[in-house]
Amino acid sequence: SSLSGTETGFNIQINLSSDVLFDFDKAELKPEADADLQKAADIIRQKGQGVILITGHTDSKGSDAYNQRLSLARAQAVKNWFEAKGLQQNYQLEGLGATRPIAPNTHPDGSDNPEGRAQNRRVEIIVNKTTQLGN
């Protein structure tokens, strides 16, 4: 599975690989995205309270403005998929483009790092387990 997650006392962060969810440069979900999205939906259904934050992320290829739009469109596509499956929640969407990399887009010598860029192309879902943080 291309889905990974971490859980704290307050929330669960789910990471989904954009390469599994979307074709290159597209914001339409691929059919093979269903399995990972279903797992994420199950977590939201079981644990979700309050706001569900969906953020899209890209690698560093392309302009900042373009990547921001693409990442937001991808977050919207994931939200639409959840809602089509009857998962009505208070969703908050963000398109962060290439501003929050989790891996280097280039090697130390400045050459391209395809593996790092692949990790950065992702959709993150933050599932709040409590309606108010700090409770």
Model-derived regions: residue spans:
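Periplasmic OmpA-like peptidoglycan-binding domain that tethers envelope proteins to the cell wall
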Residues: 55-135
